[in-house]
């Protein structure tokens, strides 16, 4: 993610953007974002769903450390959704829980947009 490594973009900013987007994907099943952010967020969403498939206390705590409150769900609701609904949905699937659909370029700054959604 070359745009993140520029001056003024700190590590804490990068991690917070990823945490926010992971939480939004879990809450809404899809988000619209830039292509580079979608590619980076995809790794973390797949990782957190793999944690949910283990369903141990340690995996719940690891997921709780990543997820944040969203506008429609609290952190506890997201953890509940992750460890009940999504865990059952992806038990027979080994990876590849998300897909990226390209939307084209945004009018204002000509950056490529994409939809990151759960399969």
From Swiss-Prot:
InterPro entries: Ribosomal_bL17, Ribosomal_bL17_CS, Ribosomal_bL17_sf. SUPFAM superfamilies: Prokaryotic ribosomal protein L17 (SSF64263). GO terms for biological process: translation. The keyword Glycoprotein does not apply. PROSITE patterns: RIBOSOMAL_L17. Pfam families: Ribosomal_L17 (PF01196). One of its GO terms (molecular function) is structural constituent of ribosome. GO terms for cellular component: cytosolic large ribosomal subunit. NCBIfam families: L17. PANTHER family: LARGE RIBOSOMAL SUBUNIT PROTEIN BL17M, RIBOSOMAL PROTEIN L17. Part of the 50S ribosomal subunit. Contacts protein L32. This is Large ribosomal subunit protein bL17. The lineage of its organism: Bacteria, Bacillati, Mycoplasmatota, Mycoplasmoidales, Mycoplasmoidaceae. The gene is rplQ.
């Amino acid at each position: 993610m070359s745009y993140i490594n520029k001056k003024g973009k700190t590590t804490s900013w990068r991690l917070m953007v990823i945490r926010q987007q992971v939480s939004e994907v879990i809450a809404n099943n899809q988000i619209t974002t830039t292509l580079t952010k979608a590619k980076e967020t995809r790794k973390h969403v797949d990782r957190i769903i793999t944690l949910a498939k283990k369903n141990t206390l340690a995996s719940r705590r690891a997921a709780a450390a990543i997820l944040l409150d969203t506008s429609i769900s609290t952190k506890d609701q997201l953890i509940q959704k992750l460890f009940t609904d999504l865990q059952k949905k992806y038990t027979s699937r080994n990876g590849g829980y998300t897909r990226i659909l390209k939307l084209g370029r945004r009018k204002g700054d000509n950056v490529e947009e994409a939809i990151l959604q759960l399969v």
